[in-house]
């Protein structure tokens, strides 16, 4: 009923109902809220999938869906949200892989998709996120190597990749991410799977 009420206000710019006891699903008609800038639904009990129609919300700056019971894949249409600065999908039941279209989010500062069942490789297109400050993908089933393209994320301050199935070596480009500051937090699994002998790899 709350969703039905919200959909009656097409000029709405902010929806913040985080940390409640909301249940139900995200309906495709949410794409009708074309003026929406903030959609904050975290820490509820929402279920179902993330509809692709969310990509129609071209004004969206903040999308918070963390700590719900969402499942399925991250829709590729999220890559159409060119004004998005924060994307928090953490602690759901999302699976499949990270879509390469995430690399289209040129203004993104936070990407948190931690603690669920995402698989596959980290897409090299994440290296396009030059404004990214925080990247948290810990606690998934991601595999493959850590892409060297992450070295292009020149604003990055924190990167958490531990508790995955990543392998290989972290390249020197990671330690060169900041010109004026050190990379504050780089967390990986430093035993057997990932070789991290770099000075900036301060935590395992």
Which sequence ranges carry the predicted segments?
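Conserved hydrophobic beta-strand positions in leucine-rich repeat
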Residues: 15-17, 36-41, 60-65, 84-89, ...
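Leucine-rich solenoid repeat scaffolds
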Residues: 154-204
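Eukaryotic tandem repeat interaction scaffolds
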Residues: 64, 82-145
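Leucine-rich repeat
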Residues: 1-38, 49, 55-60, 79-84, ...
